[in-house]
């Protein structure tokens, strides 16, 4: 399609957008009395209007039923998390038995490491990407130290080539092959938080398995953003947060994927608690643990119902729309944003550099823009004008036009504000 940098053309794209009505299902903050242009769905998604209703429902049941709400609430609490299984499975490309909702992301990665990081003999190394999200770095380092190894020896980082912004798949595969039988685990972020690069998870997973390692993925920036086929790719485990693209609310519950081939392995190590116990016998208070025959066996404590309520509200919208429709809109709106950025760059003779891959198969919703010659003054100007973006050192603005609630006219309007901000210096 031939794009045009005009308001009329942007409105035309909005009129053709099959999921544009969902914009009205979210609450926008306001600046100067106008809805903001919201580019940070990759940090915290907007609040769905139905979220309050779902939370109020739980509050009402708690007030009227108290402890009896576990079994007699409108959506009973003891099995509340089970309402997520099929819907989440469709988002991440899994069987319903392979997904569960519990805890938060780094907590879940630690728990999954109990099962999937089992160093012994010469097989003790973890392969990850350089400059992973800091929480992943801390988690991996602490796990390595816990097992008695030095991070400088046990952690192998995949590096970008000098002068390049993104990782090359062939370099990742080469590193996996080089480490070989010393590798216990490959653990990478499926979408790089800084550049927005999407990794070839299927190919990398196979390469890790070929050397006898487990392969897991941190999908903090992947779930609800990109096409995932975790079962088909034979991924061992994955975890993600729900408050970014999945709009569940600040710090809300994480999701986990555990490949079904591990569900009934009696020898798999795992930290256990009563909510992973056979649900038919859970309240018999038996001394011996009988695991659920699903990913729920990895649950430890009962679910935080008030937290899960807004998550369920959002997830039901995902189920209505479906990932294919979201990805179709995502590709189009990100391409239009990219076009607008290039147009403004030429008009003002600036020197923006989009460090996210240009190939739509290698990126999701996020475009990371390196502002050569610009600084935080421009970022602050955008924020003051109601353009909510995200700053990452050094000099990068991350823009993530979430397809559920961002419009094509937002992209045009952002371009005009950006141009004004540069020219007004």
UniProtKB/Swiss-Prot annotation:
Residues where N6-(pyridoxal phosphate)lysine occurs?
Answer: 244
EC no.?
3.7.1.3
Q: In which pathway does it act?
A: Amino-acid degradation; L-kynurenine degradation; L-alanine and anthranilate from L-kynurenine: step 1/1; Cofactor biosynthesis; NAD(+) biosynthesis; quinolinate from L-kynurenine: step 2/3
Gene Ontology biological process terms in this record: anthranilate metabolic process; L-kynurenine catabolic process; L-tryptophan catabolic process to kynurenine; NAD biosynthetic process; quinolinate biosynthetic process
For this protein, the record's InterPro entries field holds: Kynureninase, PyrdxlP-dep_Trfase, PyrdxlP-dep_Trfase_major, PyrdxlP-dep_Trfase_small
- The first-level EC class reads hydrolase
Q: Which GO terms describe its molecular function?
A: kynureninase activity; pyridoxal phosphate binding
Q: Which UniProt keywords apply?
A: Hydrolase, Pyridine nucleotide biosynthesis, Pyridoxal phosphate
Q: Where, in this chain's numbering, is pyridoxal 5'-phosphate bound?
A: 105-106, 133-136, 218, 221, 243, 274, 302
GO cellular component labels: cytoplasm
Q: Which Pfam families match?
A: KYNU_C
Q: Which cofactor does it need?
A: pyridoxal 5'-phosphate
Which reaction does this chain catalyze?
L-kynurenine + H2O = anthranilate + L-alanine + H(+); 3-hydroxy-L-kynurenine + H2O = 3-hydroxyanthranilate + L-alanine + H(+)
Family, per the entry? Belongs to the kynureninase family.
Q: Subunit comment for this entry?
A: Homodimer.
Role according to the record: Catalyzes the cleavage of L-kynurenine (L-Kyn) and L-3-hydroxykynurenine (L-3OHKyn) into anthranilic acid (AA) and 3-hydroxyanthranilic acid (3-OHAA), respectively.
Q: What is this protein called?
A: Kynureninase
